[in-house]
Curated annotation (Swiss-Prot):
CC per GO annotation: mitochondrial large ribosomal subunit; mitochondrion
Major location category of this protein: mitochondrion
Localization annotation: Mitochondrion
Quaternary structure, from the entry: Component of the mitochondrial ribosome large subunit (39S) which comprises a 16S rRNA and about 50 distinct proteins.
Species per Swiss-Prot/TrEMBL record: Danio rerio (Zebrafish)
Stated name of the protein: Large ribosomal subunit protein uL24m
Key word Ribonucleoprotein present: yes
Gene name for this UniProt entry: mrpl24
Amino acid sequence: MRLTALLSMAAKVALPHGYRYGTNRPWTIAARRLNPPGKRRRKVFVEPIANEDWPVVRGDTVEVLSGKEKGKQGKVAQVIRARNWVILEGLNTHYRYVGRSGDYRGTYLASEAPLLLKDIALIDPTDRKPTEIQWRYTEEGERVRVSVRTGRIIPKPVFQRKDGIVPQQWKDGPKDTSPEDTLQKTYTPSLKTLEEEVMEKMNIQENRRPRKSYWY
């Protein structure tokens, strides 16, 4: 595991009581604008689903079951478990202007709106049709998703970070620090100052003595 992954796991955002989740990350400016301090918003009731029972992960191929995009298949770009939302690449989009000013009308952009988990279904790799799933265990004890219609195992896609790096396929380059070097203890605490440690390491002898000074 790389150092950046360890630091991201250690960092946790403390959210106030009654915080309403959206499509933006809680630490972004857009999320703070929707949840200003002192403002109480109506509670949104969400069907509880355990993290280990979530049937869809980022990178899955699903089909839309209802709405204007019904029957279309797409790839899951983002999963928001706090609201049972799933965002698909290029589907269920709405258009808006961003950065509008007095003389400039702004940039016309497409933005994907979230879909509820009940409005999508996983695609069976056997026939490329939507299917319900069940959680089962293999002979090796691995918990997998199984299609109810065909009994085919639906494998999870390879985990890919936001920057496009696949941790399982990553190879350290000449400028990367290996985990072994990162975890190695190279500093020995002492009561010496930084200057004294540098002088000792470089074998510098300081024979000068400061003169006495007097304050009047």
